Amino acid sequence: LTETLPNHAKPLLVLKIDVDTYRGTREGVGHLVRMIGARQGRATFLFSLGPDHTGWALRRALRPGFFSKVSRTSVVEHYGLKTLMYGTLLPGPDIGKDCAAEMRAVRDAGFECGIHTWDHVLWQDNVARRGADWTVKMMRKAAARYAQVFGVAPRTHGAAGWQMNGAAFIEHDTAGYAYASDGRCVLKENGTLANPADGPHRLSVAGKALKCIQMPTTLPTLDEVLGCEIDGSTITAANIAAFLLRLTEGATRDHVYTLHAELEGQKLAPIFEQLLAGWQAQGYQLASMADYHAKLAAVADTLPLCPMTWGELPGRSGQLMVQAPAAA
């Protein structure tokens, strides 16, 4: 069902699926495979391959903005109390060891798979301030485990929490990744692109142009807008699909949407069903990152070169990788 390549005449809606936790891998992933497969869609699943230490993330509670997000999205409801104890009151399960069969089932269903991270919380909370040795060691641990699970080397990556550093981007070239999705396009408060021309680009790190094509997320995530007041209306489970579909109406460009196995694959699945139906009705092809890369082949040499940059996004606490204006 997923062997036919997409019709590139249609704009692509790239489904980039971040799988952060043991529970998400065990339960959410299978739901997403069925939902997307039922629509003959394609997608890329990015797996966390080492220990689930989600409980460590509670330290982020000290960060400004964290509590407003938690109260909006009900972390316990979506992640489950047990998951929030991993690494604190309970030992963190080893996702790549315990869920290898679930991961291979995604590949066997015809979906692209790639790396999210080794240890989601460890990476997200540390990589911005760590050096090359720590960074490369973590990435190679994830790559080795991926090869163990799938029997082949990984081909792509999407960073946990959109957190990276220069050494991590350089490691993509060393690993031979042709494309990745590690950052975000800057968004306005209403979810629209601050720079409508943003999209696929290459990065310049420490003055060196890298080969790996970055395909940044162009749309807000559900947890960034759920419960927020935007243009005078509160975004709720009842109207969030319509809100996101307004951002893609007209189907004038390709989009990358990041979803989470723990959200869209579980409690928020009914919203995701509305989005899938809506995007297909708008004329989009539900696509994988590999599909997008294939579509970009003709223009790969003309993509802008942008410096590595940090920034903030509405509805998300802290700094993350964002697309900067192209280098002059």
Q: What function would you assign to each model-found segment?
A:
Residues L1-T156, G161-C212, T236-Y257, E264-A328:
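Catalytic alpha-helical scaffold of carbohydrate-active enzymes acting on polysaccharides/glycoconjugates
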Residues T217-T248:
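Aromatic-anchored helix/helix-loop segment that forms the rim or "lid"
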Residues T221-L226, L259-G265:
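Active-site clefts of carbohydrate-active enzymes
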